Design a protein with these regions (language model features):
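Short hydrophobic-aromatic micro-motifs
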Residues: 20, 141-144
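N-terminal strand-loop-strand
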Residues: 1-37
Length: 163
């Protein structure tokens, strides 16, 4: 698998919810104020699953031992095609207490996957201005790469529930 990054789509419940983080709005970063799945660059010696689990721990205090990995459900392009990102689908093994664990994240929470099934519309992002996406509860804005990935996750989860 030719990828350089990985994200963890940690899903639970009925209706299905997925864990997201918001990249801190108080730092000067390309990703500032973006809603994202926990994830990042693959380090030497890691595979996509190991990367996704490490990043979930680093960004949201979700310990790898509390996660059941269901598999890699696809690869998506990000950063205008410069990154190839593996999407790792998982579910919690039991109760977890996710919360921001680094200065790069200022929010961790669960969003209902039903929020991404409609048609995207123009919404105002705190840093980027008007983008095509979804306004989520709490004033979060979902758009771009994470929106595409969560639409794939929602379709995959729906198919698995119907099987």
């Amino acid at each position: 698998m030719d990828v350089d990054s990985a994200v963890l789509a940690l899903v639970w419940g009925d209706p299905a919810r997925v864990l997201v983080v918001r990249k801190s709005c108080s730092v000067d970063s390309y990703w500032a104020c973006d809603v994202a799945l926990p994830g990042g660059s693959i380090e030497v010696g890691e595979d996509p699953v190991a990367t996704a689990l490490r990043e979930a721990w680093e960004e949201s205090y979700v310990h790898p031992s509390m996660v059941e990995v269901l598999g890699v459900i696809g690869v998506e392009s990000a950063a205008k095609g410069l990154r190839r990102v593996a999407v790792v689908l998982a579910r919690p093994k039991g109760p977890i207490d996710p919360r921001p664990s680094s200065s790069e994240v200022d929010f961790v929470g669960w969003i209902n996957l039903d929020h991404v099934l409609g048609e995207p519309r123009e919404v105002r992002h705190p840093r980027r201005g008007v983008v095509l996406g979804f306004e989520l509860p709490g004033g979060l804005v979902l758009w771009g790469f994470t929106m595409r990935v969560l639409r794939r996750v929602a379709s995959t989860v729906k198919l698995r529930l119907e099987a």
